[in-house]
């Protein structure tokens, strides 16, 4: 169980809480309120007034398919030799060690749909 206190909470539904608390148990939010007493054995985190929002969903990206260190050799999201490339699959080229994943997490992205680029008429299958 985790209690986050002193957070600027911006929920999807309901009023903004400039100095609120959020209680989560087993990975699920169980309470959001201006004040919540910490249950026994609960881990308490002081957010220090930081913004707390629901996780962001990235609906179209190429995260894990573009290795910036390799320049064009690492761009696995576009195959521009043909206009139709339905055989391309993100799962075949995704790099789970891509440094963009931790950057996205730090930015609040919790879900991402990654796949081939949009340079082709039919570009392939997203993961």
Task: Indicate residue ranges for each PLM-predicted region.
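A cytosolic small-molecule/anion-sensing beta-strand core signal
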Residues: 5, 25-26, 116
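Short, glycine/charged-enriched secondary-structure capping and boundary segments
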Residues: 18, 71-74, 127
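Short gly/ser/thr-rich secondary-structure transition/capping motifs
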Residues: 12, 91-94
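Active-site loop-helix segments enriched in His/Asp/Glu that coordinate
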Residues: 96-127
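Catalytic metal-binding/acid-base residues of hydrolase active sites
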Residues: 10, 62, 117-118
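Histidine-rich, glycine-flanked metal-binding segment
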Residues: 9, 13-53
